[in-house]
From Swiss-Prot:
InterPro entries documented for this protein: ATP_synth_OSCP/delta_N_sf, ATPase_OSCP/dsu
Pfam families in the cross-refs: OSCP (PF00213)
Entry protein name: ATP synthase subunit delta
Intracellular or extracellular location(s): Cell membrane
GO cellular component: plasma membrane; proton-transporting ATP synthase complex
Topology class, membrane: Peripheral membrane protein
Family of the protein in this entry: Belongs to the ATPase delta chain family.
Role of this protein: F(1)F(0) ATP synthase produces ATP from ADP in the presence of a proton or sodium gradient. F-type ATPases consist of two structural domains, F(1) containing the extramembraneous catalytic core and F(0) containing the membrane proton channel, linked together by a central stalk and a peripheral stalk. During catalysis, ATP synthesis in the catalytic domain of F(1) is coupled via a rotary mechanism of the central stalk subunits to proton translocation.
Length: 180
C-alpha cells in the first residue's frame, strides 16, 4: 500500500523537526531547508530526474551529490533517505510541512490582504500588527493584492479565516437588508 504525498510529507517532516529540535539545530535546519526548497523550485525537473528509473543510477547519484555535499549531517540524512526510498518528488512537500511545524512553534501566520489600492509599507505593518494581536500571532507575513472591486476597506484571508471589512461587502449587506 502506497502512502499519499501528504502522509509522507507529515511523517518525514515531523521526524526531522523533532530531531532538529532535540539537537538544538532547528534554526539552522530551517534555513537550510529553505535553501533546498529554492533549489527544487528553481529546477522543477530535478525531483523528477532524481526519481526517474530510466536514468542510470550513476547519473541520478551525480545529480544528488551537490545536494548532499552542501548539506549538514541531518539534512544530508534526510535527502539520502528520501532518495533511497524513491520519494524525491515529495521533497518540496516535506519542506512545506516542516515550514508548517516551524510556523506553529513560532506563532507565525501567513495572510493575504486585498484592498482597492496599493498599500504603503506603513499601512501593511499596521495591518500586520492589528491582525497579529487579533489572532494571537507573534508574526504575520502579509502578501497584498489589489482588487478595485473592493471599492474601499480591507479583506484579510489567512488559512480558514476571512475578515472582510470591505466597502463592497457592506454595500452588498445593505442591499440584502433593503430587499428583505
Amino acid at each position: 500500500m502506497s502512502l499519499n504525498r501528504a502522509t509522507v510529507a507529515k511523517r518525514y517532516s515531523q521526524a526531522l523537526f523533532d530531531l532538529l529540535s532535540e539537537k538544538d539545530q532547528l534554526e539552522s535546519g530551517y534555513t537550510e531547508l529553505q535553501e533546498l526548497r529554492r533549489i527544487f523550485q528553481d529546477n522543477p525537473q530535478l525531483s523528477t530526474m532524481l526519481s526517474d528509473a530510466s536514468l542510470q543510477v550513476a547519473d541520478r547519484e551525480a545529480l544528488l551529490q551537490p545536494l548532499l555535499k552542501q548539506a549538514s549531517p541531518y539534512i544530508k540524512n534526510l535527502i539520502q533517505m528520501v532518495y533511497d526510498y524513491g520519494r524525491m518528488e515529495n521533497m518540496v512537500d516535506i519542506i512545506d510541512q516542516f515550514q508548517v511545524l516551524y510556523d506553529e512553534l513560532h506563532h507565525t501566520v501567513y495572510a493575504e490582504v486585498t484592498t482597492a489600492v496599493e498599500l504603503s509599507a506603513e499601512q501593511k505593518s499596521q495591518i500586520e500588527a492589528v491582525y497579529a494581536k487579533r489572532v494571537g500571532a507573534e508574526k504575520v507575513v502579509l502578501s497584498s493584492k489589489v482588487d478595485p472591486d473592493v471599492i474601499g476597506g480591507v479583506i484579510v484571508k489567512a488559512a480558514d479565516t476571512i475578515l472582510d471589512g470591505s466597502l463592497r461587502t457592506k454595500i452588498n449587506r445593505l442591499r440584502q437588508q433593503l430587499l428583505a
